[in-house]
């Protein structure tokens, strides 16, 4: 995972405050926040989340619950308040029993009209914190899914899918950006939501539930997704990264280009505008609601 990616995003999210007070105390606060983004911190988060103790963080199982508690403790430690009344957004998913992979369903009230038969239930929980902005009722959501594939007892040797890249790397990124905001005390232009989704591997369940139930979804001005940023797609170009964004919002590419120049950040983004950006990660839940998005991926 590249520290430079996190620096670029933090600088972009603080852009509204920077435009108003470009020098002096504001700049010093930003640099204090940037100093908290370190390789050591990234490794510490990833090593814990991908540890065998969490048994692959399967949605609805003990490992993913431990991951959620770890994230929650980091939020409290940094003094980041919850977005809603509580940090946890609990919900249920239901799937009819099947020999193959289950197809999970979520409903806004978690009360599902189902026909008779055998069903499986998952108790899931998103973790949501927020730093209020100058426009408190407008939102930018920065998110990563916390779950992974769990275990496969049929595998010889090590049966655990640890999920260091997918997606301990993304969770680590969002945790570090959150800490940088908290340490800087910079007030962003819009409220920044730090979201950690449960159940992504089962069908984007956590982000789908949020986008269906958050009462101010029409005031979400953008979603920034971190999923699988821990491996080199092009090892011969270590600065390479894929930068998906909503094609109808070219400013999402412009701000990254501007900060790369201004701060001499060593990244080589592969800019990929999408005319209809859905995709196979949590960005899809927001795209279906018409929310413009960015997806960092390596």
List PLM regions with ranges.
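N-terminal hydrophobic or amphipathic helices/low-complexity stretches enriched
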Residues: 19-82, 131-132
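Second-shell loop/turn segments in exported
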Residues: 28-36, 52-62, 114-118, 155-167, ...
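Structural recognition of the beta-strand scaffold that forms the well-ordered cores
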Residues: 45-50, 89, 126-130, 139-143, ...
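Acidic/His- and Gly-rich active-site-bordering loop/insert found
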Residues: 49, 75, 117-153
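A non-catalytic alpha/beta surface segment that caps or lines the substrate-entry region
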Residues: 57-130
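Alpha-helical metal-binding/catalytic segments enriched in His/Glu/Asp
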Residues: 127-129, 142-148, 152-203
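Metal-dependent peptidase/peptidase-like ectodomains
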Residues: 197-295
